[in-house]
Structure formats: C-alpha cells, structure tokens
C-alpha cells in the first residue's frame, strides 16, 4: 500500500512539474572551431519569458559531452560539471535581476572540436529555489549550423548535404532498365523470362513444410490486401529442396505461379522477403516473370541498437524488427544496459529498473540516476528518451516476434566496464572509485574489478538469456591484460 501511495504521489509531482511553464527560454549558438587553440566558441542566450523579474533563485541544467570549460571572469553566471556530461548554470554575484523579456548572453569556450549535431547541449531543465524534485523542462533552441567553420576542423572532414549531393551527381544512370527485382539487398541472379504475373486480392498458398515462413508470408500479404484462399488460379508454393544449403533460395515467377524453393526455414523466409519486396516495387502487384537465385554472403547480418542511452518504446522496437526483417538482416544486437541506464526488468533485482531506468535532476542518485543525453530532469516522464524499461513479458514477446520474422536477438550485458547504472542501482560498497567520476575516464576501464560487484548478475542474466548473450568488455585497460588475477576472473 505504501509503495502504491508513493507511486501516486510521484506521478502527481511529475504531472505538476510538466504543467509548469519554465521562466526562461534558452537558445544555444555555435561560434566557430579553433576560436582559441584547442577550443571552440559557443554561447547561451537566456531570456526571461515569465511575467515577473527573475532573481537569483534559479539554476539551469543541461547535458553535453564532457568538455573542459573556459569562462570569462565577468560572466553573471557560474557553470560547473555536476557529474560527467551534466552541467549546472548558477547566477553569481555579478548577476543582475532579469526583467520580463530581457536576455543575457553567456559566452563559453569548450575544449575540442564541434563536428556533429550530437555535440550540442540537450536535456535542458530549470530548478527554482533549489527544489530538485520539481524540475521544469526547458527545450534548448539550437541555432542553425550554416558555416563550415561551425562543424569542421579540417576541409571535407564531415559529409554535409552539399558534399553528398555533389557526389551523387557523379554517378551515372544505370544502363539496364529497372524492374521489380531491383531491390535491396540485390539478389545475386535475376533472369527475366518475359511476360508478367499479376498477384490479385486472393492467392492459393501451397506447401506446408516451412511453417514460420508461411505464417510470415500470409501476414505480410494480408498487410498488402492479398488474402489466401484455395479458389484461385494464382498460386504461391513453398517447396523444400536439400540441394539448397544454408539460407539460399530460388524463386521462379511464371504465368500466375510463384515457386519458392529452399533447403531451410530461413532460406525460405529469405525467398518470401524477396517476393514481398518485389511486390512493393511493382506496379499494381504485377511481377515480371523471372528466375531469381540468391544466398547471403554473411551468416551474421546484424544491427546494434542502443536503448540504454536513448530509450525507445516497445512498439518502436517491433517496428525496428520489421525493418530488419524486410532488409534481410538477421541479428538484433540489443544494447540495453550501459553507464547511462538499465532497460530490462530482471526478477529478483527490481532496483535495476526502479533506479537505473530513470534519469532525473539529482546529486545523490538515491532514487534515480543523474541525467545524461536528452530528457527534462523529470525521472517519471515516460515521453522522454531518458526514462523507461521493458518488462519481462515484453521481452518474451519481443523475442517471439523477432523469431517469427527470422531475426535473432542477442542481448548485450555490459560488464565489467560501463556497468555504472547497474552498480548505482544495487548500491554495492565494493566500487573502488567515487561514482560521480565516470564515463570516458579510467575507472570505466578498471574501477569495477571486484568479484562481489557482479555476484548478483549471473543467475539473473541466465533467466533472461537462455540461448545467447554478449558480455561486452569494451574498455580493457592495459593493467587488466597484465594482471593474471583479473584475467582469471574474466575467464571464470
């Protein structure tokens, strides 16, 4: 009952915060790279958009890749990095009350080079009177990057739209006329045999060996207004032939009949995907008669999706799987945990999602972790990519959904490096460095080397990943490689 009341109260606070209007509007403007050796210039323009004078009782927070700051000694605000990538802007003694409609400019020099839009500030929010439980979201307006010196440190080091357009202009038109089998990925062999086969609203489907491929095909045809029935002369036949190995298939389209032959379920599914793609690229479902032969060059055709840093919904995950299947990618590398968050419910460790799937304005991280990347400072706002997780039931459904479309899901468990979110959540006292110092620094590589830190994980990991899992060891330090004790732990 107490937990339910806590959730209701938390939600009420979240809705109140969302309903509030921020007293400031913030615009970020890029200056130029190399404004000072090793630094680029930028500025915030902070405007009082409220109806009252803005005193010193506010702090503005934002996220940005960690950069060493250089500030002028006459600025009316101080800027400090609260935790890695999380910055606080606070009025100082030089600050003068901002009247309604007035603005102030905060000029900054930041270490490094601005080369990509992902380097700009994001996740803005303002706190009034030090009340971090009631952050108010501030959408940071980003001024256009119009000049090359704003996003290039060397000539042509970033392929902007003009450069890509000029490159495309150099490509010559294809010599052969296009047909419906000009799809991606392109089949190895397409021989047009003359004539056409029209796929109407109804077809007869024959062959029952490849159940998954058959169900997938019927579902995709239905989405395109084509239904299976036994009373029509247009037929689609799925046939098994052991002479075709692996994921190879052949498809023959001829005078109202489509024959897909394969030696395996996945091979047949590839043939079905070619048929579906050809229909999408045809005019009124009118296929050229042809013999199509194809097989993938790579058994692993993967796509890595990082939902730790930027969460996406369960429905969006299914859409991603749909796209992978359509383009014959067969592996979803599922990066669901990192320093920034843990996104999958694990029975027995509720704190992993109670704490580590939520990011909000905090300095102690007792209830949720500090902001990074986008968000509005509110840990309970599920409209933000900073917050959210997948339930155990959703994960089971996602795995089944992927399998039905010929896609294998490989969850990635980030250990021992980049495991900060999980370690913050389970509050272990075995971490060898202070938690606020992390990401891009050496303790990411070797700060979490004690055995106890990862004791709770193996049993719970196996409940989720009974077939495949990847334990990412992306940031090994040289001291790991020369330390037999640590190497032994990893082997265990």
Residue ranges and their predicted role:
Residues 1-23:
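Bacterial Sec-dependent N-terminal signal peptides
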Residues 20-38:
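Low-complexity, acidic Ser/Thr/Pro/Gly-rich terminal tails and inter-domain linkers that flank the onset
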Residues 34, 53-83, 122-125:
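Short acidic, flexible loop segments centered on an aromatic residue
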Residues 35-43, 104:
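Short, solvent-exposed loop/turn segments enriched in Ser/Thr/Gly
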Residues 45-52, 468-469:
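Asparagine-centered strand-capping/turn motif at beta-strand->loop junctions
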Residues 74-115:
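Intrinsically disordered, low-complexity Pro/Gly/Ser/Thr-rich segments with frequent PxxP/GP/PP motifs
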Residues 120, 124-296:
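Acidic, contiguous N-terminal accessory segments
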Residues 244-246, 250-464, 472, 485-492:
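Feature activates predominantly on carbohydrate-active enzymes
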């Amino acid at each position: 009952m107490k937990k339910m009341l806590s959730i209701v109260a938390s939600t009420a606070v979240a809705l109140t915060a969302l309903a509030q209007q921020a007293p400031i509007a913030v615009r970020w403007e890029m200056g130029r790279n190399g404004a000072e050796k090793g630094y680029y210039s930028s500025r915030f323009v902070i405007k009082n958009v409220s109806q009252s004078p803005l005193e010193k009782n506010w702090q503005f927070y934002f996220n940005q890749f960690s950069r060493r700051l250089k500030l002028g000694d006459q600025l009316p605000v101080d800027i400090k990095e609260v935790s890695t990538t999380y910055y606080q802007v606070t009025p100082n003694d030089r600050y003068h009350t901002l009247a309604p409609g007035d603005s102030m400019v905060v000029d900054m020099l930041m270490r490094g080079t601005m080369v990509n839009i992902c380097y700009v500030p994001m996740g803005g929010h303002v706190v009034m009177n030090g009340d971090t439980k009631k952050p108010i979201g501030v959408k940071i307006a980003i001024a256009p990057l119009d000049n090359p010196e704003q996003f290039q440190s060397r000539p042509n080091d970033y392929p902007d739209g003009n450069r890509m357009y000029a490159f495309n202009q150099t490509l010559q038109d294809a010599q052969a006329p296009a047909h419906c089998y000009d799809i991606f990925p392109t089949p190895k062999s397409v021989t047009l045999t003359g004539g056409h086969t029209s796929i109407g609203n109804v077809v007869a489907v024959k062959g029952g060996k490849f159940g998954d491929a058959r169900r997938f095909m019927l579902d995709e045809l239905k989405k395109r207004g084509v239904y299976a029935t036994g009373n029509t002369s247009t037929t689609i036949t799925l046939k098994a032939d052991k002479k075709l190995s692996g994921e190879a298939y052949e498809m023959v389209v001829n005078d109202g009949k489509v024959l897909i032959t394969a030696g395996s379920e996945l091979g047949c599914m590839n043939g079905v995907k070619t048929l579906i793609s050809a229909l999408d690229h045809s005019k009124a479902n009118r296929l050229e008669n042809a013999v199509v032969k194809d097989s993938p060059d790579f058994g692993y055709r993967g796509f890595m999706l990082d939902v730790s840093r930027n969460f996406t919904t369960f429905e969006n995950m299914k859409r991603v799987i749909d796209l992978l299947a359509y383009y014959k990618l067969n592996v979803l590398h599922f990066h669901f945990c990192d320093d920034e968050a843990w996104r999958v419910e694990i029975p027995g460790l509720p704190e992993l999602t109670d704490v580590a799937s939520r990011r909000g304005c905090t300095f102690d991280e007792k209830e949720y972790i500090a902001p990074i990347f986008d968000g509005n400072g509110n840990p309970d706002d599920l409209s933000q990519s900073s917050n959210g997780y997948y339930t155990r039931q959703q994960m089971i459904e996602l795995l089944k959904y992927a399998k039905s479309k010929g896609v294998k899901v490989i969850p990635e468990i980030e250990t021992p490096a980049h495991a900060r979110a999980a370690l913050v959540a389970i509050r272990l006292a075995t971490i060898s460095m202070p938690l606020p110092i992390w990401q891009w620094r050496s303790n990411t590589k070797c700060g979490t080397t004690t055995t106890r830190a990862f004791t709770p994980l193996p049993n719970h990991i196996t409940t989720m990943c009974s077939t495949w899992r990847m334990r990412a060891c992306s940031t090994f330090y040289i001291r790991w490689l020369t330390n037999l004790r640590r190497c032994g732990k990893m082997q265990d």
